[in-house]
Amino acid sequence: MIVVKIGGRVVKNSLDKIILDILNINDKVILVHGGGDIVTDYTKRLGIEPVFVTSPEGIRSRYTTKEELEVYIMAMSLINKSITSKLCSLGKNAIGITGVDGGLLLAERKKRIVVIDERGKKRIIEGGYTGKVKEVRSEIINHLVKLFDIIVVSPIALDVEERTPLNIDGDQAAFAISKALRANVLILLSDVEGVLVEGKVINRLTPSEAKELSKKIGPGMNRKLLMAAESVENGVNKVIIGSGVKDRPIINALELNGTVIANG
């Protein structure tokens, strides 16, 4: 079983390449998609100014109000059904779901978050409607893969305590699903060719090397490396970080082009 995460820019600019590539894969595929740029577009169209916050680690993320949560769900559902309909129209047996469906992804809402304000000072603010995955009901996917070849998953989770959907990070969703399924491979596709150090792609890292390197590279990729190391330590065979904008992006990753995090 292969888990593939495609970032928002890949969804917006290279989706057809991803879909054509999936047609040539004979394994079961769990496709987790992002879509931040598209969410921002729809937010602005509806007259809502998107708000982004920066963590003390330098990671910039969307601040999700109740109003923007509704737009997020709408946009992600549109992306999900667009991907699923294209796959089905090309003869693939696919289904599109969110992490809310069946309680696939159970999360906890972030009650408070620490941000860096416009003066460069740390400040604690109300957490909005973003969450952290706490549980994956892997039996749902295990049942679905008996019926479908491809499962397209939107990164929306269910907050059981407050009974509301939550915006969750797409990478986090993909890592959580991969660990729960003990997937053979997790592929992370974005607009970079892999982990870059001094402009060159690092081809292979062990989990311990990935953790060490995470201390020396920029925000965003450092988090990917930490989660990749944890995934391999928890039963995922390998994690591959590669380009989603080149031709044959998934096949290229399976041929180990990019950065591979694995034991040994």
From Swiss-Prot:
Reactions catalysed: [amino-group carrier protein]-C-terminal-N-(1,4-dicarboxybutan-1-yl)-L-glutamine + ATP = [amino-group carrier protein]-C-terminal-N-(1-carboxy-5-phosphooxy-5-oxopentan-1-yl)-L-glutamine + ADP; [amino-group carrier protein]-C-terminal-gamma-(L-glutamyl)-L-glutamate + ATP = [amino-group carrier protein]-C-terminal-gamma-(5-phospho-L-glutamyl)-L-glutamate + ADP
Pathway(s) where this gene product acts: Amino-acid biosynthesis; L-lysine biosynthesis via AAA pathway; L-lysine from L-alpha-aminoadipate (Thermus route): step 2/5; Amino-acid biosynthesis; L-arginine biosynthesis
Major subcellular site: cytoplasm
Alphabetized GO MF terms: acetylglutamate kinase activity; ATP binding; N2-acetyl-L-aminoadipate kinase activity
Location in or out of the cell: Cytoplasm
EC number: 2.7.2.17, 2.7.2.19
EC main group: transferase
CDD domains: AAK_NAGK-UC
Annotated site residue numbers, Transition state stabilizer: K5, K224
UniProt keywords, alphabetically: Amino-acid biosynthesis, Arginine biosynthesis, ATP-binding, Cytoplasm, Kinase, Lysine biosynthesis, Nucleotide-binding, Transferase
Similarity annotation: Belongs to the acetylglutamate kinase family. LysZ subfamily.
NCBIfam families (alphabetical): argB, PRK14058.1-4
Protein's recorded name: [LysW]-aminoadipate/[LysW]-glutamate kinase
Organism: Saccharolobus solfataricus (strain ATCC 35092 / DSM 1617 / JCM 11322 / P2)
